[in-house]
Every structure is written in structure tokens, then in C-alpha cells.
């Protein structure tokens, strides 16, 4: 229980610093670059704390009596998601101030960044790789995403972009 508490406190402090302090925001960007590039010792620390997080979630799932057929990790869809976005610039996405965005206003939703000016996919960009991977592995007729109200706008944008790329994701 010490590890989840430590992770929670670090996450809360990091999130607050990211929002309140421009130098912290820059530092987070540098750390992300190190993780993506697998630069030591940052990458090993990330793997270690990621394992702590997964162990904790596993204990929660066991307590709830639930299981999952498969876990999908961001690292699995980083490249494919980014490539799907790049392949659809000028069709679904557009370049804007060095980033690649989905201009959602014309579809009744809002604009979001899918690839940053530094060339890294955002959560939205990675979702572009996740949908096709999930479909490839499970060949579903329908996918349900149970999320909180604070995430509904995010998924509205993601689902609209996916639908425009591949009609299998429509509706």
C-alpha cells in the first residue's frame, strides 16, 4: 500500500506543478522525451513505477472479482497511432503551428492536438492506433467505453476522427 500512495502523491504533485509552473511543464516534456527514447536512468525508473501501478490495479481487479482478456498499453500504439495521424493529414487532420490537430468544429465537436510540435502523439493520437488494434484482435460488432463525464468530450473527438478514417468505427 506504500507504493500506490507514493505514486498517487507524486501524480498529484506533478499534475499541480505542470498546471502552475512553466518550468515544471518543460521538465515533464523532457522526461517524456527520455522515456520515449528509452534514455537511462529515466526509462528504468518509469518501468519500475509502471510495474507498481500495474500490481496495484491487479489487486483491485482481484478484489472486485473481474478480469480482462487483454491489456493494451500506450507503448504498443505510440508509433501506429502517430503514423495513422500522419497518413491522414489533409484528410482528417491538419497542421497548425507545428502540431497536427483535428479541427472538430466542422463536425460539431472541438479541436484537439493529436501530434505535438515535438512530434509526439498525444493520448488522442495514440487512440488512433488503439481502435484498429482492438478491432484486429477482437473483431467486435460494437465497443462500449464506460468513462466519466469529464472524458466524454475527449472521446467524442477521438471517435469522430476514427470514424472519418475508417467507417468500421462509425456509430
Question: PLM ranges: what are they?
Answer:
Residues 1-171:
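NTP-dependent nucleotidyl-transfer catalytic core
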